Swiss-Prot record:
Binding site for sn-glycerol 3-phosphate: K108, G136, K191, D244, S254, R255, N256
Major subcellular location class: cytoplasm
Name the UniProt record assigns to this protein: Glycerol-3-phosphate dehydrogenase [NAD(P)+]
Record-listed NADPH binding positions: S14, F15, R35, K108, S140, R255, V279, E281
Gene: gpsA
CC terms in the record's Gene Ontology section: cytosol
Organism field: Pseudomonas putida (strain GB-1)
Length: 341
């Protein structure tokens, strides 16, 4: 990648726009592609993304575009910030163009039909590409407002990690590296489910002890499931695990938290999602995660409980009561209890 070669950001949402701005602030020319030509034109003219990041000026180095073919041809490093439901359909027709490029997924979701993570879909579409993911406690608006933030880029390709660090690392945005791509990406996808529960708990006025219990048991569930799928449990003690879980489960700026809060206020799921106006990946992830947990026989009572609330008519109070009545287990799965007398 030459100094003047643009970096591509695919997606016109809040996180894609925040990352595009970060790149441009570091002197990197950026082409931000979006499917809606009207959105691209409005962003070009007004230098703002009013639907997703209202009030944040779009850096002059970001060029909103609508031509995907030209964008991919011009860029060797591509950040993919497309909804999980659209990623395959958008990129599969251009598989040949992706050969050899660095593809970094920013999307925290799971494909419903296959239970594949976004980087696995990218790998399937473009097996000759260099694949990575970016994940962590990264609220888009705070990044755009230059709040001090850290993230993780994960890839088996060390040079790709270094390349991402070089273009993204800045005064207010620190980029760490990891080789556990699967664990980092799985942490980012799974925590969205628990943010819905956390938002509901706050709306219903539950105490700090309860919220702390929910977040901690969520981390236990996430780690238990991830290890069953081959991830490193230590990854979940870092930014992409507990870090992302804390911010997503405690901030009203989190989209999945907002959905949970609306549900706790008595809105239907459809009303909660419509009120948000953006994609809340946690709702889609919940369905496939519950099915997968049953398939591989991993104990995930919070996932089962939230599914019962959203799709089976249960209440959060009923789910927590069931959780409290369940047989007590050890606190941390990966610590031996052989020393008990």
């Amino acid at each position: 990648m030459t100094e003047q070669q643009p970096v591509a950001v695919l997606g016109g949402g809040s996180f894609g726009t925040a990352v595009a701005n970060l790149l441009a602030e570091n002197g990197v020319p950026v082409r931000q592609w979006m499917r809606d030509p009207a959105q691209a034109e409005a962003m070009r003219v007004n230098r703002e993304n009013p639907r997703y990041l209202k009030g944040i000026r779009l850096h002059d180095g970001v060029e909103p575009v609508n031509d995907l073919l030209a964008t991919l041809q011009a860029s060797e490093l591509v950040f993919v910030a497309l909804p999980s439901s659209a990623l395959r359909s958008v990129l599969a027709p251009h598989a040949e163009l992706l050969r050899g490029k660095g593809l970094v997924s920013l999307t925290k979701g799971i494909e419903a039909q296959s239970f594949k993570l976004m980087s696995q879909i990218l790998e399937e579409i473009a097996p000759q590409a260099r694949i990575g993911v970016l994940s962590g406690p990264n609220l888009s608006r705070e990044i755009a407002e230059h709040a001090l933030t850290a993230t993780v880029v994960a890839s088996e390709d060390e040079k790709l990690c270094q390349q991402v660090q070089a273009v993204l690392h800045g005064r207010t945005f620190r980029v760490y590296a990891s080789a556990d791509r699967f664990g980092v990406e799985l942490g980012g996808a799974l925590k969205n489910v628990y943010a819905i529960i956390a938002g509901m708990a706050v709306a219903l006025g539950m105490g700090e002890n309860t919220k702390s219990m929910l977040i901690t048991r969520a981390l236990a569930e996430m780690t238990r499931f991830a290890v069953s799928q081959g991830a490193n449990p230590m990854t979940f003690l870092g930014l992409a695990g507990v870090g992302d879980l804390i911010v997503t489960c405690s901030s009203p700026k989190s989209r999945n938290y907002q959905v949970g809060y609306a549900l706790g206020e008595g809105h239907s799921l459809e009303e909660a999602v419509n009120r948000l106006g953006e994609v809340a990946e946690g709702v889609n992830t919940l369905k496939v995660l519950k099915a997968k947990a049953q398939e591989v026989q991993v104990y995930m009572p919070l996932v089962a409980g939230l599914h019962a609330i959203l799709f089976e008519g249960r209440t959060l109070n009923q789910v927590i009561e069931h959780l409290m009545r369940a047989e007590p287990k050890t606190d941390v799965d990966f610590i031996s209890i052989s020393g008990f007398n």
